[in-house]
Amino acid sequence: VVIVGSGAGGGVAAAVLAAAGQRVIIVEKGVYRRHREYNQREMEMINTLYEGKGLLTSVDGGVTVLAGNCLGGGTTVNWAGAFRTPDYVLRECAEEHGNPHFLHPDYQEGFDFVERRNAVTTELLRHNPQNAALYEGAERLGYRVKDIPRNMKARPGLDPEQFWRDQGFSPLGDANGSKQGSVETFLRDALAQGAQIMP
């Protein structure tokens, strides 16, 4: 089986198919960088890790799209927010667009599976002063406020303060491997089952 892309979709597909005994080859056009190569220099990382050097737009220029052009795709360059598709969107897809599988229990089990493997949690969360003020202000105004779950895992031996500082740089690649994107999770699983990656 040839899988094109190594991000959120490709990584999961590769791991599941390899575990099922399929011979899997993952084709990725983007670069691979080791953790130590994520230097947190904004322009260099954007130029290296993002499709179109971060300037990818729709044909009419009305929408800017930030897409990963690296091993792990968007899971390498996202900000680690990991929330489920809202129920109202799933209902719309099922009822108005003829895709009933979005409401099937197996689909929800898929969310559970991915969240477990990606260590999705709100426990490793600390608001900076700006976000804390926004959170508190919204609560005082009567808005419902919730923390956004993130796919993060504290690394043993990593200074907790360094962990928190590094989170601000996670869209530029995670130098410590705390963000549990495709490279840290599903691609490792796929490789352990014999899958291969072709750059």
Regions found by a protein language model. Give the residues of each.
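N-terminal glycine-rich phosphate/pyrophosphate-binding loop and immediately adjacent elements
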Residues: V1-E96, P100-P105
